[in-house]
From Swiss-Prot:
E.C. designation(s): 2.7.7.6
Gene designation per UniProt: rpoC
Reactions performed catalytically: RNA(n) + a ribonucleoside 5'-triphosphate = RNA(n+1) + diphosphate
Species annotation: Bifidobacterium adolescentis (strain ATCC 15703 / DSM 20083 / NCTC 11814 / E194a)
NCBIfam families in UniProt: PRK14906.1, rpoC_TIGR
Protein name per the record: DNA-directed RNA polymerase subunit beta'
Length: 1337
């Protein structure tokens, strides 16, 4: 079999009949599959062993040759080659067709490639292929031209002859009438009626004669006229006319029906001439004609440049895929389950064999044509069932799955088997919390670990002598003997495992942990890892995977350990934050209660304070004074203060002061709880002497994450977690019904506002308010009432209330929920998203009335349905984003560009003071400067140089110096040919360091945007206000709209050019007229609705691109008017706005990566002297290269315009046909790719995953492929501190050893011959340790 590492590119093209025969190992002649008596494949059938190989390894069909020693022999009795049965997955067969058939992809695909090439409408083509019309394939024009005068003469003579005969017959009939009349008169019966009857009858007969001859003349004229103008490609549906023409002039032309006609046309088709003619048409034509010529030229050019043969679109031979890919399985009841393909192949073979027989029998043409049509339909069904006409169905009317269906869709070969493989060495189980686990550890159930590490355990058991061989070791493992567990402990030590929770929405959904053996059957997960996995313990399951090779383990340990993945790649904030119980415990510790036991007491040391606490003399939350040593880092702005003493002893002061002593130590006022809390933070971190609810804690952890190494951050987080869990029970927080305190004035508030609501309703009744105004006033009224009740609820919750502690600490819940429990539920929305003006006046403590319950549930249920829909919609968005950006990899260190984006770093408030912009951490942060930053104070001093990174400290420093804008590098301005460069991308937000070459930043970007997708709303909100614009799309639909580059709903117009605005109201609405500054341009009128809020006033002067009314702007118009950079920036800002409105932080650089891919292509307008075609969509790099080549050769460069493509379109337009085919529209992509003989360079991730190669990202990059790992003792000891690798005094069986227990005399050195003077002791030094081997061997 072909090794994937032996090729760098993959080409797809059209297979000719010879190619198919070369692939094949034999012709399938019979429709039989297997013999139902012997259950063996039938000879020459669809499963024949002679063609496809033996069904059993190393055994022929008749059993004459068995065993591997006969490898390669072909049995002379049964004709089967002795080889492995797996060849039945690779070997192909073929069917020789009795009549050619067209390939349905090229005929029926949209657009029809056959139709374009031959310039025939698909309808007409269908008539020819399915035997409803004849097609002229060849005309001997020279001979016809030469013989035409003679033929004309012959035709004229024949016509004259016919006319002569016609006239003679009529004349004869006329004479007979005269004779009959004379006879009547002679007999004396000359009545008028009899004569009239006779005359009428004669006239009718003469008219019939005339008609008969006229029809013959007409038919002859029609045949001759048709023949005179006949040219190749002409079609004729009139069978009689065709036969007449064939009988008379068959020597001058050839023609037939079906695929045979198409084949002949394709064989004679002159591609060069067609290309030349089409190019002329493009140069001279306009409109539809030019557009069609362009499309045709694309197809003609494809054949010209690739060497594909057009006639390969018509098949004489069809391939039969290997039998193991279309298996037949025996079921329990003796019946067989078979792949649909076997039925489809069977239909083809049956019809083909029948056709062959009819041809041999010399059956009439009509029968043959019918059989050929049926064969064509059978092959169509095999290739793409249902593409034309009714699909072929199996039992229970289910359409059979054709070859195309096996590739298409989620269950197709691409997505099911190539991109979604099953993995060995994996398991899955329910997860439970492991509060005692460190961040980098996970608990693995013993039975699961034993199964996963089985091969390792077996090897170790044999190595350590517990078993003689593998077989007995396996028995030990199966019995789970006691020694097995000890060996398992040893094997799993330092061997990381990967844990994954579905859905894996971002890269933190798979992380590495060190396994710890645990009892039971559940996986134990450290609590700090839950946020990254979005895991909870209500029955969630997780999968475990085992990295096997040393490289895989090293990669898992260095890149994927949970303790290293502390920052979220989407925004750079910490993802491993203490939560819930931990926060409660830490909040309790850092809270100081005034008047607590022991307040104001002074201690000479921490130890003394601890002793006092143990003896219950002071409270954990009491403010005491403790003398701290000089190396203690105090808060930045600490100044000595005073502490009031509770219950001072007689004669003692009632106030104690903080002070600093001459030896540097300080008497510091804090609580013992805060001392404990600070004990978990790094030693040199400033003392945190304040309460630490969730928000404060988050800031502390973020700060530590930016200032300290990952190992220190992980240690701090573990310490915080342990302390939080330990102290949470000490707080004694639990909450009961009595903790829910309802404000006593609640009823008063409700009565007061009910009165006001009655007044509003009265005003409405008497006509003073409209329905819309009444509704708005009621909504405003009850919103005010709810907020007042909420304030009252908050006032009545004192700081000691358990419910208040839970909420204030940030452990769980918020005041809004408390208000619903203890205050009033307030206004609720209906399923449309409109606010119902009737409020829910009760709270959950009192209980809701039936009506209140109903209106509450109505909207709530819609919310649940929405969530389910949103998940699917968001998943699909993520899939498209991944597909469009999967080949964006950091390919080089620096692209060398001097370009960048201008970004705001400071903004001024109302007083004019400069502050850091709100979204600094999502914009300029983590980028590199594209230009030096000059101090605005003197205009000379360089504050920071180009290439410096913008950290938060640098940004704050810039604002302090009065800098408002900087020019920073961006993915949008990167000039790398493929992917992006490290300097334009900036820092990796997951590490806060410059991104590594090889980082798959495209996929990280797609995950960062897609992962929070489910949090976005699905609705398009109706504002409910009077002066608002129409419904503005928000949430997920808006993000989709932007990334798909669609024209937004309720589009806001922008000024096409600079000019003066005139706003005027009309009968139907309002219109904005833009009068240009340049008189040569016509003014433009924009109709807008009266409700739309205007952004310009009458008489304003506006610049090109100015938005005229509120709403969403079409990015395609921005691209046309203001250029690509403005369009890119607009999309980035709009997407960011949507996410920020939902409280989701995403760094702009992720959105930029996607937008960069959307504007990667250029539409060629004028091809100049390049090989590009007008109207063709080409990659920027290819466009640039073609132009440079043209200029170099002194030619004219091509002209083009940038094209904004939606992510779906951009994914399908990718250079990689493998990637595009595995995304959507598989058959269309493969048809197009085969026609153009596309080559896949295998530069992206998907295409390498599909063919089973290492992905060209991370350590899979070519530059890292042959890296060798050198052990470094110092580093090794820091990474594996508990492993005993070279550590002092370790007794680990894997550590350094003195080798004294090794018996060198029994070592088998294979082919290595030892000298007679060989002495094992030469290898040991005086202490029994190993010496330098030198040249001993």
């Amino acid at each position: 079999m072909l090794d994937v590492n032996e090729f760098d590119k993959l080409r797809i093209g059209l297979a000719t009949a010879d190619d198919i025969r070369n692939w094949s190992y034999g012709e399938v002649k019979k429709p039989e599959t297997i013999n139902y008596r012997t259950l063996k494949p039938e000879k020459d059938g669809l499963f024949g062993e002679q063609i496809f190989g033996p069904t059993r390894d190393w055994e022929c069909a008749c059993g004459k040759y068995k065993r591997v020693r006969f490898k390669g022999i072909v049995c002379e009795r049964c004709g089967v080659e002795v080889t492995k049965s797996r060849v039945r997955r690779e070997r192909m067969g073929h069917i020789e067709l009795a009549a050619p058939v067209t390939h349905i992809w090229f005929f029926k695909g949209v657009p029809s490639r056959l139709g374009y090439l031959l310039d025939i409408a698909p309808k007409d083509l269908e008539k020819v292929i399915y035997f409803a019309a004849y097609m002229v394939t060849k005309v001997d024009e020279e001979q016809r031209h030469q013989d035409l005068p003679d033929l004309q003469q012959e035709f004229d003579n024949e016509i004259a002859n016919l006319e002569k005969r016609r006239n003679a017959e009529i004349e004869e009939r006329a004479k007979k009438v005269e004779a009959d009349l004379a006879e009547l008169e002679a007999e004396g019966e000359a009545k008028g009626s009899a004569r009239a009857k006779l005359r009428n009858s004669a006239e009718r007969e003469m008219a019939a004669i005339r008609t008969r001859y006229d029809e013959q003349i007409q038919r002859l004229s029609a045949v001759f006229d048709r023949f005179k103008t006949l040219k190749p490609g002409d079609m004729e549906g009139d069978v009689d006319l065709w036969r007449e023409m064939e009988d008379r002039y068959g020597d001058y032309f050839e023609g037939c029906m079906g695929a045979e006609a198409i084949k002949k046309r394709l064989q004679d088709f002159d591609l060069e001439a067609a290309s030349k003619q089409l190019r002329e048409e493009i140069d001279t034509g306009t409109g539809q004609r030019k557009a069609r010529a362009l499309k045709r030229l694309k197809v003609v050019n494809a054949f010209l440049t690739t060497g594909n043969k057009p006639e390969a679109m018509v098949l004489d031979v069809i391939p039969v895929i290997p039998p193991d890919l279309r298996p037949m399985v025996q079921l329990d009841g003796g019946r067989f389950a078979t792949s649909d393909l076997n039925d489809l192949y069977r239909r083809v073979i049956n019809r083909n064999n029948r056709l062959k027989r009819l041809i041999e029998l010399g059956a009439p043409e009509i029968m043959l044509n019918n059989e050929k049509r049926m064969l064509q339909e059978a092959v169509d069904s095999l290739f793409d069932n249902g593409r034309r006409g009714r699909p072929v169905t199996g039992a229970s009317n289910r359409p059979l799955k054709s070859l195309s269906d096996m590739l298409k869709g989620k269950q197709g070969r691409f997505r099911q088997n190539l991109l979604g493989k099953r993995v060995d060495y994996s398991g899955r189980s329910v997860i439970v919390v492991g509060p005692s686990l460190r961040m980098h550890q996970c608990g693995l159930p013993k039975p699961m670990a034993l199964e996963l590490f089985k091969p390792f355990v077996i090897k170790r058991l044999v190595d350590q002598g517990f078993a003689q061989n593998m077989k007995s070791a396996k028995r030990l493992v199966d019995r789970a003997d006691s020694e097995v567990w000890g060996v398992l402990e040893e094997v799993i030590s330092e061997h990381p495992v990967l844990l994954n929770r579905a859905p894996t929405l971002h890269r933190l959904g798979i992380q590495a942990f060190e396994p710890i053996l645990v009892e039971g059957k559940a996986i134990h997960l450290p609590p700090l890892a839950c946020a990254a996995f979005n895991a909870d313990f209500d029955g969630d399951q997780m999968a475990v995977h085992l990295p096997l090779s040393a490289e895989a383990q090293a990669e898992a340990r260095s890149l994927m350990m949970a303790s290293d993945n502390i920052l979220k790649p989407a925004d750079g904030h910490t993802v491993t934050m203490p939560s819930q119980d931990m926060i409660l415990g830490l909040y309790y510790l850092t809270t100081v209660i005034d008047g607590a036991k022991g307040q104001g007491r002074v201690f000479s040391s921490l130890e003394e304070a601890e002793m006092a606490l143990d003896k219950h003399e002071i409270d954990m939350q009491a403010k005491v004074l403790i003398r701290l040593p000089q190396d203690f880092v105090l808060p930045k702005d600490w100044e000595p203060g005073e502490v009031k003493v509770v219950d001072p002893e007689p004669g003692s002061p009632d106030v104690v002061k903080e002070e600093r002593f001459h030896d540097g130590s300080v008497l510091f006022a804090t609580s013992y709880g805060r001392i404990l809390f600070n004990g978990t933070l790094p030693v040199d971190y400033p003392f945190v002497n304040e309460q630490a609810p969730k928000k404060r804690l988050s800031k502390i952890v973020d700060d530590i994450a930016t200032r300290y190494s990952t190992a220190q951050v992980a240690a701090t987080l573990d310490a915080l977690k342990d302390l939080g869990f330990t102290r949470a029970p000490w707080s004694g927080v639990s909450f009961a019904f009595s903790d829910v305190i309802q404000p006593p004035e609640l009823d008063e508030y409700i009565e007061k506002y009910e009165g006001e609501a009655d007044k509003v309703n009265e005003n409405y009744e008497i006509g003073m308010l409209t329905e819309e105004e009444r509704r708005q006033e009621l909504v405003d009224l009850w919103t005010k009432c709810t907020s007042e009740v909420s304030e009252a609820v908050e006032e009545h919750f004192d700081s000691k209330n358990n419910l208040a502690i839970i909420v204030q600490s940030g452990a769980r819940g918020n005041m809004m929920q408390i208000n619903q429990i203890a205050g009033m539920r307030g206004l609720v929305a209906n399923p449309k998203g409109e606010i119902i003006p009737r409020p829910v006046k009760s709270n959950y403590r009192k209980g809701l009335s039936v009506l209140e319950y109903f209106i509450s549930q109505h909207g709530a249920r819609k919310g649940l349905a929405d969530t389910a829909l949103r998940t699917a919609e968001s998943g699909y968005l993520t899939r498209r984003l991944v597909d469009v950006s999967q080949d964006v990899i950091v390919r080089e260190e620096d692209c060398g560009t001097k370009r960048g984006l201008t970004m705001k770093v400071g903004e001024r408030d109302a007083e004019g003071n400069l502050h850091l912009v709100k979204a600094a951490d999502g914009g300029p942060y983590s980028r590199l400067l594209a230009a030096d930053v000059i101090d605005p104070a003197d205009g000379e001093t360089v504050l920071y140089k180009a290439g410096d990174a913008l950290s938060m400290d640098v940004l704050n420093d810039l604002v302090a110096h009065g800098v408002e804008e900087v020019k920073a590098r961006s993915v949008l301005t990167c000039e790398s040919k493929r992917g992006v460069c490290a300097k334009c991308y900036g820092w990796s937000l997951a590490t806060n360091k410059l991104v590594d070459v090889g980082e798959a930043v495209g996929i990280v970007a797609a995950q960062s945007i897609g992962e929070p997708g489910t949090q976005l709303t699905l609705r398009s909100f109706h504002s409910g206000g009077v002066a608002s614009a129409s419904d503005i799309t928000q949430g997920l639909p808006r993000v989709t709209e932007l990334f798909e580059a669609r024209t937004p709903k309720g589009e806001a117009p922008i000024a096409e050019f600079a000019g003066v605005v005139k706003v005027e109201d009309t009968e139907r609405g309002r219109q904005v007229t833009l009068k240009p500054d340049d008189d040569s341009v016509e003014p433009i009128v924009y109709p807008v609705t009266r409700r739309a809020p205007m952004l310009v006033k009458d008489g304003d002067h506006v610049e090109a691109g100015t938005q005229l009314i509120e709403g969403s702007v079409d990015p395609k118009k921005i691209l046309r008017i203001l250029g690509p950079r403005a369009a890119q920036v607009n999309i980035v800002e709009e997407v960011h706005t949507v996410y920020r409105s939902q409280g989701v932080d995403i760094h702009d650089k992720h959105i930029e990566v996607i937008v960069h891919q959307m504007l990667r292509r250029i539409t060629v307008i004028d091809s100049g002297d390049t090989d590009l075609l007008p109207g063709e969509l080409v990659d920027k790099a290819r466009f640039k290269a073609a132009n440079m080549e043209a200029v170099k050769n002194g030619g004219k460069p091509a002209a083009g315009r940038p094209e904004l493509m939606g992510i779906t379109k951009a994914s399908l337009a990718t250079d990689s046909w493998l990637s595009a085919a595995s995304f959507q529209e598989t058959t269309r992509v493969l048809t197009e790719a085969a026609l153009n003989q596309k080559v896949d360079d295998l530069k992206g991730l998907k295409e390498n995953v599909i063919i089973g190669k290492l992905i060209p990202a991370g350590t899979g990059l070519a530059r890292y492929r042959n890296a060798t790992v050198e052990p470094d003792k110092a580093i090794r000891d820091t990474i594996y501190p508990n492993f005993g690798l070279g550590g002092e005094g370790t007794d680990s069986s894997f550590g350094d050893t003195d080798l004294s227990d090794v018996d060198f005399s029994n070592i088998d050195f294979g082919d290595l011959k030892l000298g007679d003077d060989f002495n094992p002791d030469d290898f040991l030094d005086d202490n029994g340790g190993q010496t330098d081997l030198g040249d001993t061997l």
